[in-house]
Regions:
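A short, N-terminal "cap"/entry segment at the start of jelly-roll beta-barrel domains
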Residues: 1-34
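Ligand-binding loop in jelly-roll beta-barrel domains
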Residues: 22, 83-108
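Conserved hydrophobic/aromatic beta-strand scaffold that supports enzyme active sites
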Residues: 24-26, 37-39, 58, 78-80
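Short, charged/polar surface micro-motifs in flexible loops or helix N-caps
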Residues: 32-34, 44-46, 105
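Short histidine-centered beta-strand/loop micro-motifs
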Residues: 38-40, 49-53, 70-71, 89-91
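Glycine- and acidic-residue-biased ligand/ion/polar-headgroup-sensing regions
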Residues: 44, 53-68, 75
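Residue-level marker of beta-strand positions
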Residues: 47, 77-78, 96
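Short acidic-glycine-tyrosine-enriched beta hairpin
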Residues: 68-88
Length: 109
């Protein structure tokens, strides 16, 4: 994507993902690379199963608390994962995270 994109994410509906308790708002999708930026909203007890990041991943916790590979990340935490890294994401209390993916890997629909 080579042009500017501005979105009021509050105007987007939360869509149910294929995983129970996880909804999403897709902010950006690059049709050429498959890269995307997505908001994920986790209900208490939700789990995003183990998956690989072929192109890496950037993640920012907007609210709540998530456990990734045994480590807890709370509101305001940022995490970068290099290409080919593997993880799962769990929350006991609920959370909203911003995920930026340079390449497609896990189907977030």
């Amino acid at each position: 994507m080579t042009s500017e994109l501005t979105i009021d994410s509050n105007m987007l509906a939360w869509e149910q993902s294929k995983w129970p308790g996880i909804r999403r708002r897709q902010l950006r999708l690059d049709a050429e690379t498959g890269g995307r930026t997505v908001l994920l909203k986790f209900e208490p007890g939700a789990l995003l199963p183990r998956h690989m990041h072929p192109g890496g991943e950037e993640l920012f916790v907007l609210d709540g608390r998530v456990r990734i590979e045994g480590k807890w990340y709370e509101t305001g935490w940022y995490r970068y994962q290099p290409p080919k890294s593997v993880d799962d994401v769990f929350t006991g209390t609920g959370a909203t995270i911003l995920v930026m993916l340079p390449k497609p890997h896990v189907d977030l629909t």
